[in-house]
Amino acid sequence: MRSHRSVKVSLVGAGNIGGTLAYMLGVAGICQELVFVDVMDGVPRGKLLDIGHALAISGVDITAVGGSDYAAIEGSDAIVVTAGLPRKEGMSREDLLMANAAVIKGVAENIRKYSPDAFVIVVTNPLDAMVWYMHQCSGLPVNKVVGMAGVLDSARFSFFLAKHMSVSVSSVSSVVLGGHGDLMLPLLKYSTVGGVSVSDLISCGRLSSEDVHAIIERTRKGGEEIVKLLKSGSAYYAPAASCMNMLESYLFDKRCVIPCSVGLDGKYGVNGGLFVGVPAVIGKNGVEEVIEYVLSQEEREIFEKSVGLISNSVKIISEQK
């Protein structure tokens, strides 16, 4: 898709997700100006040079700036934050909490200084707590700060379900709620294969409860599985693609319903401005609507446990900041 207006997108963090997303943005041509910032000044510059060479093969022009100076993000339409320590094998997201909170604070202060009108997507883990802290430190409106998680979790669930049933993943639609972690909650009555809910597929014997439970567990451990296989590093293709999905919905006012971490104040019974993964309409104004599903008692209990973990992480940050 090619943009019909001047669009500036900035990426903060030049690791694998940031680098992959920069390449995807260049190929898609959805922004006229791309900024890539990292504390390691040469890394974003080197990656952008490599990306420019790759795009030249296809005859695609790109205007991009890389470096360590945050002043370059001034006037950005959208900013994607991937900066932070990566998760290593055996490391929980909670292990990263305070270290990455310090990173987010620094990034947020620069966003507030240079691009207070931007739409900000946070990818840094522990995701839901980091999005909350970004909102707190940046002072941006709650509708302009979101976390990328639910769309990735939903994609993983759809992928594993499609593989198990030997159908195209394009025939699968999934809804995953809750925090980005071990208590993420796929909603079986709203997740479908060929228009038939997973709940109904279980009822008619096409799927067993045991099979679905195994798929859910593999979804929850999807990131960890990749970390173990890679030995060094974590997932980056799917997270980058998830960010693209969110960026396109915002920049082109697509108003797609996308599961992502958003600030809640009453929806799903969550108060206090916590950021939790729920389906939301993303359009030109950022988060334009939160879609609220009716949950069963069991789903409600799992969701509340997930919210409790997020609340605990937020409390730890609040007490130490």
Swiss-Prot record:
The keyword Oxidoreductase applies. Pfam families: Ldh_1_C, Ldh_1_N. It comes from the Bacteria. Substrate binds at residues 87, 93, 125, 156. It is an enzyme of class 1 (oxidoreductase). NAD(+) binds at residues 13-18, 38, 100, 123-125. It catalyses: (S)-malate + NAD(+) = oxaloacetate + NADH + H(+). Its EC number is 1.1.1.37. GO terms for molecular function: L-lactate dehydrogenase activity; L-malate dehydrogenase (NAD+) activity. InterPro entries: L-lactate/malate_DH (IPR001557), Lactate/malate_DH_C (IPR022383), Lactate/malate_DH_N (IPR001236), Lactate_DH/Glyco_Ohase_4_C (IPR015955), Malate_DH_type3 (IPR011275), NAD(P)-bd_dom_sf (IPR036291). The keyword Hydrolase does not apply. Keywords: NAD, Oxidoreductase, Tricarboxylic acid cycle. The active site is at 180 (proton acceptor). One of its GO terms (biological process) is lactate metabolic process. Belongs to the LDH/MDH superfamily. MDH type 3 family. Catalyzes the reversible oxidation of malate to oxaloacetate. This is Malate dehydrogenase. It comes from Anaplasma phagocytophilum (strain HZ).
